[in-house]
Amino acid sequence: MVFLLCFFLVADVSYGINGDCELPKVVGPCRARFPRYYYNSSSKRCEKFIYGGCGGNANNFHTLEECEKVCGVRSRDSPKEN
């Protein structure tokens, strides 16, 4: 039983990124212009984008800090603009 507990703890730590952070950026079909952040799995950093206001997914954060905290990213430079 202890072995299983250790196995799952190691597996959880080694996986690292929250599954929501691996979702693609979705601007959505609506035409609002909300500045948001998403985790870009290619660049491995949080980047700014303009969210339309509807039809998004969980990879959509109000602040850079929230994105970095949830997705386990350390801030490097200012975010890329998209």
Swiss-Prot record:
Does the record's keyword annotation contain rRNA-binding?
no
Which residues does the propeptide include? 76-82
* Entry-linked InterPro entries: Kunitz_BPTI, Kunitz_BPTI_sf, Prtase_inh_Kunz-CS, TFPI/VKTCI-like
Record GO terms (molecular function): serine-type endopeptidase inhibitor activity
Residues of the BPTI/Kunitz inhibitor domain:
21-71
Q: Where is the signal peptide?
A: 1-16
Site positions for Reactive bond, renumbered to this chain? Answer: R31, A32
Q: Where in or outside the cell is it found?
A: Secreted; Nematocyst
* Disulfide pattern: C21-C71, C30-C54, C46-C67
The UniProt keyword set, sorted, is: Disulfide bond, Nematocyst, Protease inhibitor, Secreted, Serine protease inhibitor, Signal
Tell me which domain of life the UniProt entry assigns to the organism this sequence originates from: Eukaryota
What cellular component GO annotations does this protein have?
extracellular region; nematocyst
Q: What does this protein do?
A: Serine protease inhibitor that inhibits both tissue and plasma kallikreins. Has hemolytic activity. Inhibits voltage-gated potassium channels (Kv).
The UniProt family comment states: Belongs to the venom Kunitz-type family. Sea anemone type 2 potassium channel toxin subfamily.
What protein name does the entry list?
A: KappaPI-actitoxin-Avd3e
Natural source organism: Anemonia viridis (Snakelocks anemone)
